């Protein structure tokens, strides 16, 4: 699968570790294999990019299945889980880290503090990205909006901040417009291929590659987004169309309000 996306023109592939924290793996009785599973995922991705200059491996860290703001898990337990997974990913050789599908600002802050502490302890410098998920209601699951997220995350030395999952690109426009004028760093956008539907008992995404690419090009050309990709429902065909759509497009200049 990594190879198919790289062949389509992707410059970065994510490790298959979105749900590879001990918190999630314990639900399947394999939490004791956390380090092993993360290391294997990094090895798979690194094998895929071998011999492909200018291609990188991003270590994916999902939100787990517990939200601290809702009392699902203690801060100490969440911190320990992130530290274990981060250590495995970094020691296995990822080029950057992505905290994605973030739904709880408390969770993000705990993860980031743990991330930068772990990198310091390991003596490593790895770029850190954050991607939040906002529902069609306009907020994260715990009720925070894009403004609250931006203010909360601005003090951290992030490589980028942006959105992924939950919706297609059309439902992200207002949030990205806000970041265009309020977020001082790089912006990323990785939408789903529209909203999922159930067809014959299977989840299906209706947004076709050409339309996906057209909408994503606008984010780069008009909103100054510099990192683009796809989340649920994204196929190599979507990435191929996206690469062609933005190949010669430079991110629009942005003026951030003071």
Regions found by a protein language model. Give the residues of each.
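Domain-level signal for soluble alpha/beta catalytic cores
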Residues: 1-258
């Amino acid at each position: 699968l990594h190879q198919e996306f790289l062949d389509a023109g992707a410059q970065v592939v994510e490790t298959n570790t979105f749900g590879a924290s001990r918190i999630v793996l314990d639900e399947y009785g394999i939490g004791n294999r956390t380090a092993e599973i993360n290391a294997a995922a990094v090895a798979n991705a690194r094998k895929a990019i071998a011999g492909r200059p200018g291609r990188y491996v991003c270590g994916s860290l999902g939100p787990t299945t517990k939200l601290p703001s809702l009392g699902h898990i203690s801060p100490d337990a969440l911190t320990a889980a992130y530290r274990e997974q981060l250590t495995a990913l970094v020691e296995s050789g990822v080029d950057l880290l992505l905290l994605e599908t973030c739904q709880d600002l408390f969770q993000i802050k705990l993860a980031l503090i743990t991330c930068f502490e772990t990198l310091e302890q390991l003596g490593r410098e790895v770029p850190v990205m954050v991607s939040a998920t906002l529902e069609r209601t306009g907020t994260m699951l715990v009720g925070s909006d894009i403004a609250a997220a931006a203010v909360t995350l601005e003090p951290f030395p992030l490589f980028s901040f942006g959105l992924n999952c939950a919706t297609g690109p059309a439902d992200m426009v207002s949030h990205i417009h806000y970041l265009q004028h309020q977020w001082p760093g790089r912006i990323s956008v990785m939408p789903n291929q529209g909203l999922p539907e159930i067809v014959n008992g299977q989840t299906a995404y209706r947004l076709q590659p050409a339309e996906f690419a057209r909408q994503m090009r606008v984010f780069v050309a008009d909103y100054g987004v510099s990192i683009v990709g796809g989340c649920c429902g994204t196929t190599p065909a979507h990435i191929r169309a996206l690469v062609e759509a933005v190949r010669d497009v430079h991110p629009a200049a942005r003026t951030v309000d003071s």
